[in-house]
Amino acid sequence: MTSHGFIDESGTKDDHEVMTVALILFDGAFTAQKLHKLLIQELFPKQVKHDTKRDRRNSGLHYTDMSKSQRLKAAEILGKQPIQCFTGCFYHDGAEKSHERRFEIYTSLIELCLNDALEIHEHLDVSIAQQSNWMTYKAPLASDLSAIVSEKSARLGFRTAKFSFESAAKAG
């Protein structure tokens, strides 16, 4: 069975304390959208009830913008779901780094997450959140990730992974 996933990052700037990359895996192709809809219904019941375009525009699910009660409710809902999360992090030392160096770190964190996921899963379909200038790194990153899939296939048996790049703002 193919597991469907999404990779996104946080903290890529030098003044951020920690850079984090997460690969979230779902059992089904539409599980993320169903989960997003469930979270919206639970966290913003008035907006779902009125269901107007104006009401929906404020239903983004960014953790830092949620109240404590919304965070607890989201954790309760997510804790009951059959999802897996693979993460990697890098602690910034405060020194200024070039864009290329930050991108190397970002890439290594993605590779770490994928490597761990392929230890467990044989087939992955992964969307990667587009970062600035994503067209310039799409091909080399996909090539690096495909090399990891090949290495895991040689070591653990047949593995597949399909990669796509999607807007990070797209729900689900």
Describe each model-derived feature in a short phrase.
Residues 1-172:
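Phosphate-ester processing/binding pockets and catalytic centers
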